[in-house]
Amino acid sequence: AGDHAAVERAASRAGVSDLLDVPAADLSGGQRQRVFLAMTLAQETPITLLDEPTTYLDPAHQLSILELIRDLNGAGTTVVMVVHDMVHAARYADRLVAMREGRIVAEGPTEEVMTAELVRETFQVECLEMTDPTTGRRFPIPISVHAPELSGTLEGRR
C-alpha cells in the first residue's frame, strides 16, 4: 500500500495521473519525460539526480516541472540537475557547476557563477546580461557565437 500511495502522489505532482495505464510506447516525448520524473519522485529519496528534466516539454510544462523541482528542494530534497538552458539555470539553481570538455571551470552560488564572461569562455557564446525582475538575479541572453579561440580561463572562480 505504501508503494502504491507513493506512486499516486508522484503521478499527481508530475501531472501524469491520467497516464498511469498508458503504455510507454504510446506516450509523446513530453509525456514520457513527465512520467520519468514521476518515477523519480515516487522513490522519495533525500537526493534526486535529474538530467535535462525539461527536454521535450512545451514552455508551460517546463515551468511547471521546474516549479515542482523547486518545491521538492524546498521540502528538503537535495536536487542535482543537468540543464543547458541558461535562463532556467539562473532562475532555479542555488548553486551552479559549469563544465567544458568534462572539466569543471566554475562552481559556486548562481549569482557569482552565471555571468556573460562564463558563458563566453565556456560555450564560446557572446551574451548580454539581464536582470530577472521576479528574482533580481542576473542571467545571460545569448546574442552571437564567439568565433575566436578561448582566450582566458575561469579556473580562479572555483
Label every PLM stretch briefly.
Residues T48-E52:
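Catalytic Walker B motif of ABC-type/P-loop ATPase nucleotide-binding domains
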